[in-house]
Amino acid sequence: MNEKYSALRSNVSMLGHMLGNTIKDAHGEPLFDKVETIRKLSKSARAGNDSDRAKLIDELQNLPDDQLLPVARAFSQFLNLTNIAEQYHTISRHCEEQICSPDSIDSLFGKLNANSISQLDSIQAVRDLNIELVLTAHPTEIARRTMIHKLVQINKCLSNLELSELSHSERQRVEQRLEQLIAQAWHSDVIRKQRPTPLDEAKWGFAVVENSLWHAVPEFLRQFDEKLMRHLGEKLPLDASPVKFTSWMGGDRDGNPFVTSEVTREVMLLSRWKAADLFLGDIQELVSELSMVKCNDQVRELAGEEHEPYRAILKDLRTKLTNTRDVLAAKINKQDAPNLATIDDVDQLWTPLHACYQSLRECGMGIIADGLLLDVLRRIKCFGIHLVRLDIRQESTRHSDVISELTRYLGLGDYEQWNEQDKVAFLVRELASKRPLLPLAWQPSAEVQEVLDTCKAVAEQSREALGAYVISMARTASDVLAVHLLLKEAGCPFRLDVCPLFETLDDLNNGASVIKELMSIDWYRGFIQNHQMVMIGYSDSAKDAGVMAAGWAQYRAMEELVEVCEDASVELTLFHGRGGSIGRGGAPAHAALLSQPPRSLKGGLRVTEQGEMIRFKLGLPDVAVNSLSLYASATLEANLLPPPAPKKEWCDLMDVLSEVSCESYRNVVRGSEEFVPYFRAATPELELGKLPLGSRPAKRNPNGGVESLRAIPWIFAWSQNRLLLPAWLGAGEAIQYSIDKGHAQLLEDMCREWPFFSTRLGMLEMVYTKTNVGIAEYYDQRLTDKSLWPLGQKLRDQLQQDIKAVLNVENNAHLMEQNPWGAEAIRLRNIYVEPLNMLQAELLYRTRQQDEPSPILEEALMVSIAGIATGMRNTG
């Protein structure tokens, strides 16, 4: 590995050595030697040594069944530790400038000055800053909570080892602690034995807040504040909350029968309990710190005659928070809740603490006010008494089913059979009516009752507890109006954002016309109070049409939605449903935001953070601070220095690229009879269904083909055999087509001058770097029928041609030339991923040969799937 990454290499080597010792202690020298042999042969095979490749295959095919699991676990754990070392390196003091780019906020102000952006405009943009990160389960997040805790502890040890003043014995103790943690991880289950429930997923999300975001948010705001003061001479307002967090865990019922109205209620109680518990810890600490006596009149009035007025106020809050926790615990456990004074409104926390803050400043103790107390005030504004807000998500047909069943009961006909015009007229009439629509005597079916119960659960909450109601597979104006009507009938006393999610190619293309129709309805315009949220789906559109066509459809949809809402003088918030992988919209945050259409971030940024990406971007406080800074700087830059509108000839060529790439993608995925059998044989798609990943079934329709697969297992399966097909298919072919038609210079101009296009190519480069045609070919040879080999060869040949086409447009000799750190990081992990790939192919072969399932083989297979996902760093 390059010399400039020596600190990282040293940590990887140390952690690997410690894991080796653990394996020796647990399984003896012979197994450790076997693991080392496989690792060395794999490294040599990757360098092109065909003789060692043959030896490696022979070694794996002759492994006895009882060695498969420990060998798979060894490489999986090596990858976990490599990831930790890499993640830590980005925040360590040894981080090279190629990795740790200059501070994103400082860099931004440099750009603003260079472009003569006025101080006034900058200050206004900061005040308007509104970033909402939506934590979603889709847990491709394979790591269990227990493992994540150990990984955080390992990170702390690496940090301690950087301290130059450590004595020899102190260093030994830290190294011993590292060895203990690695041994603990080795002797624990790597993967879950049962699927997580929606409650488990929600608790995982709360753990991320508790372990990382609770600490990261005040630190991010403290740093942001200092930079604003330095560059603009202005501080953040005390009540500013430029960042907020929402969750789908326990609220996303799209295709997940396990997320019921009862589950949603319980998750919201748990969320409040965790918030009360965390604030109680903060208040306890403040009781210790704020022993001061001098105060202003307001605090004196709140504290009465107490000698230590701040402590008196804090102790009262402590009692109420303790009561709140006890009452919520009773409700969670379905017990009678005691009648106690509790915190039920965020102002009950904010008002007394804000009074303490003001008093300390007025009494010459500003330095004390700006310590922990300021952090707690910042947390109150960010997390509130609910910790995270909850989104509700449901599929559009579930709402129309409710109204169809109701209209049939009322003798009005079948709503489902009406045309769109009649549906809208009926819904608007009922929305404007003051009388209730649901008859008391009506006894709906269980599925319909569940939708109604969910709307009731929403109506019971306070507005602050909720984010938005997202309608997946939204296609029409009536889809949006139907939800508004159901919420009205449930007695919802507040306006909740009802957010259509446009996710297929056709729906993205029609999205703006749906919003335009809604804006023409007087009732709707009056009700939404000049604010509209729309979600752009990345994963299903890419599965439907391929990444190039999907990316362009998303861009055009955003452009058109911005225009429609500007014409109607309505503020638009675009909600981005990105995934961790490229095939689901994943891209480095900064590049992705700056490649969006001009003015598309004026209404703020709302974006999903999914599964494993939550851990990589937000799982450690220091890493989370960096991620929040990147989001803030990119959003500010996009609003203050928007990218130029694309030239007409660029858009015309993108239309061609989109059409050609979509046709090419669909010709393979839909047009080839061999494709589905090949997909099922060459990837672990069928076996993935057995992995206890998330609480959702892997298919919307258990009997369907590829089209019924959720986007996550579709991408996940292809990332396992290293072909990563959905993340590139069609794109390179379209680029080569345009080169052949004489558009090479235009493509180069687009790459150089248009952030949207250059970001697309950069994403493709990263995908290409992660592919491995040799590994994909081995899966074919070991697992597929010979009749399917030509299809596999055709796809691999296409991949090689596509890489050349993209490098040609970029004028680069090698992939990821502009991102050497990213390329090094992928190479570093490949040392351990490739043996796991070869082992997985062997495990799949043996599993499929057996009539009866073998628990040993199945567990080893699950470990290999988890390990490759860890190594690829974006599972789905």
Swiss-Prot record:
Its Enzyme Commission number?
4.1.1.31
Which InterPro entries does the record associate with it? PEP_COase (IPR021135), PEP_COase_bac/pln-type (IPR022805), PEP_COase_Lys_AS (IPR018129), PEPCASE_His_AS (IPR033129), Pyrv/PenolPyrv_kinase-like_dom (IPR015813)
Q: From its record, what is one biological process in GO terms?
A: oxaloacetate metabolic process
> What Gene Ontology molecular function terms does this protein carry?
magnesium ion binding; phosphoenolpyruvate carboxylase activity
Determine the domain of life of the protein's source.
Bacteria
| Catalytic reaction list | oxaloacetate + phosphate = phosphoenolpyruvate + hydrogencarbonate
Q: Which UniProt keywords apply?
A: Carbon dioxide fixation, Lyase, Magnesium
Q: Which GO terms describe its cellular component?
A: cytosol
List the Pfam families hit by this protein, alphabetically. Answer: PEPcase
The cofactor(s) it depends on are:
Mg(2+)
PANTHER family of this UniProt entry?
PHOSPHOENOLPYRUVATE CARBOXYLASE (PTHR30523:SF6)
Q: Which family does it belong to?
A: Belongs to the PEPCase type 1 family.
The record's function comment reads: Forms oxaloacetate, a four-carbon dicarboxylic acid source for the tricarboxylic acid cycle.
The record ties this protein, via NCBIfam families, to: PRK00009.1
From the Swiss-Prot or TrEMBL record, give the protein name.
Answer: Phosphoenolpyruvate carboxylase
Q: Which organism is it from?
A: Photobacterium profundum (strain SS9)
**What is the name of the gene encoding this protein?**
ppc
